[in-house]
C-alpha cells in the first residue's frame, strides 16, 4: 500500500520535511504503508536524498502532467489544501489528510480544510501534528463526497468566501 503526498504548484517545504521525519514514517508503516510517494513541487532541496525507516520506500518527483493515477493508486493522500487537489482526491473516494500551508498570505486553505473536515469529508492537521492527523484519519469513518454533484463543493466555497 502506498501514501501519496502532493504540495501542488506552490512551495510547501514544511510539509515535505514533516512527511520525511522518522516518527511520521514509522506511523505510516504501522498502518501498513510500505511506499511513500512525494510530489514535492519547488521543494527539491527540502526533499533532498530522503532517509527511510525499515519497511518504507520513498520516491519523489517535482511535477507530473497529471496526478490522477497517483491518487488512484494510493491508500491515503496527504495534500496541501488547494481546492483542485482536495476536490480531485475527494472525488476519487480516497482517504484524505489535508495540511494547509499556513505560510500563505491569504489563508483560504485553512478555511476550506476546516469546513470540509467539519462536514466529515476529510481530516485536517498542521505540519506540527501530522502524526496525530494520520492517527485520527485511520479509524475515522469519513462521509463519502457526493459524486458528480458540484453543489456541495460550491456551497463550501461560498461559505468560505463569506
Curated annotation (Swiss-Prot):
Pfam families according to UniProt: Glyco_tran_28_C (PF04101)
Alphabetical list of PANTHER family matching this protein: GLYCOSYL TRANSFERASE-RELATED, N-ACETYLGLUCOSAMINYLDIPHOSPHODOLICHOL N-ACETYLGLUCOSAMINYLTRANSFERASE
Location(s) in or outside the cell: Endoplasmic reticulum
Domain of life of the native organism: Eukaryota
This protein's record includes keyword Transcription regulation: no
Protein species of origin: Schizosaccharomyces pombe (strain 972 / ATCC 24843)
Cytoplasm found in the keyword field: no
Role according to the record: Involved in protein N-glycosylation. Essential for the second step of the dolichol-linked oligosaccharide pathway.
Catalytic activity: an N-acetyl-alpha-D-glucosaminyl-diphospho-di-trans,poly-cis-dolichol + UDP-N-acetyl-alpha-D-glucosamine = an N,N'-diacetylchitobiosyl-diphospho-di-trans,poly-cis-dolichol + UDP + H(+)
Key words, A-Z: Endoplasmic reticulum, Glycosyltransferase, Transferase
Subunit details: Heterodimer with alg14 to form a functional enzyme.
EC number: 2.4.1.141
Name the UniProt record assigns to this protein: UDP-N-acetylglucosamine transferase subunit alg13
Main subcellular location of this protein, as a coarse class: endoplasmic reticulum
Record GO biological process: dolichol-linked oligosaccharide biosynthetic process
Homology family: Belongs to the glycosyltransferase 28 family.
A single Gene Ontology CC term: cytoplasmic side of endoplasmic reticulum membrane
Spans traversing the lipid bilayer: none
Annotated GO MF terms: N-acetylglucosaminyldiphosphodolichol N-acetylglucosaminyltransferase activity
